[in-house]
UniProtKB/Swiss-Prot annotation:
<feature type="topological domain" description="Periplasmic">
    <location>
        <begin position="57"/>
        <end position="58"/>
    </location>
</feature>
<keyword id="KW-1133">Transmembrane helix</keyword>
<dbReference type="InterPro" id="IPR019713">
    <property type="entry name" value="Memb_YlaC"/>
</dbReference>
<feature type="transmembrane region" description="Helical">
    <location>
        <begin position="36"/>
        <end position="56"/>
    </location>
</feature>
<dbReference type="GO" id="GO:0005886">
    <property type="term" value="C:plasma membrane"/>
</dbReference>
<feature type="topological domain" description="Cytoplasmic">
    <location>
        <begin position="1"/>
        <end position="35"/>
    </location>
</feature>
<keyword id="KW-0472">Membrane</keyword>
<keyword id="KW-1003">Cell membrane</keyword>
<dbReference type="Pfam" id="PF10777">
    <property type="entry name" value="YlaC"/>
</dbReference>
<protein>
    <recommendedName>
        <fullName>Inner membrane protein YlaC</fullName>
    </recommendedName>
</protein>
<feature type="transmembrane region" description="Helical">
    <location>
        <begin position="59"/>
        <end position="79"/>
    </location>
</feature>
<keyword id="KW-0997">Cell inner membrane</keyword>
<feature type="topological domain" description="Cytoplasmic">
    <location>
        <begin position="80"/>
        <end position="156"/>
    </location>
</feature>
<keyword id="KW-0812">Transmembrane</keyword>
Length: 156
């Protein structure tokens, strides 16, 4: 493992710890806070469907199924899962991208990581210069930018 890769992996792990990214479902009412109209609309639609089913002779026997399904499916809105970021997921296009998104392109690295790379005696001057050029050109760097630098370091 190269020095840049090690520093990037440490940063990703500290980010996972700080943001409680552990792939575990946690009870949360963030859905209600973010989408109160949708949440109320769900209940209005549920009660409207329930009223129609109770009025119908053919559907009134399966009302219990509607109630059970609604409760089960509604339960999913009360759980958030914060997926764990991993170094191995960077620049990989597979199912995890659908789950995590391309976080490595949309999140910027902390300034502490850039400073650690620039101050590390184990990183070659060529890579430090390349990093400084990237900073001048782009301003803020994404995790993917540092990943490409780590890849360049491993090939040299």
């Amino acid at each position: 493992m190269t020095e840049i890769q090690r520093l990037l992996t440490e940063t990703i792990e500290s980010l996972n710890t700080r943001e409680k990214r552990d792939n575990k479902p946690r009870f949360s009412i963030s859905f209600i806070r973010k989408h109160p109209g949708l949440f109320i609309g769900m209940y209005v639609a549920f009660f409207a469907t329930l009223a129609v089913m109770l009025q119908s002779e053919t559907l009134s026997g399966s009302v219990w199924l509607l109630v059970v399904l609604f409760i089960l499916l509604n339960g999913f809105f009360f759980f958030d899962v914060y997926p764990r970021y991993r170094y191995e997921d960077i620049d990989v296009l597979d199912f995890r991208v659908c789950y995590n998104g391309e976080w490595y392109n949309t999140r910027f690295v902390p300034a502490a990581l850039v400073e650690a790379i620039l101050n590390s005696p184990r990183v070659a001057d060529v890579h430090k210069e390349q990093l400084q050029k990237m900073i001048v050109r782009k301003g803020e760097l994404s995790f993917y930018d540092i990943f490409t630098l780590a890849r360049a370091e491993s090939t040299s």
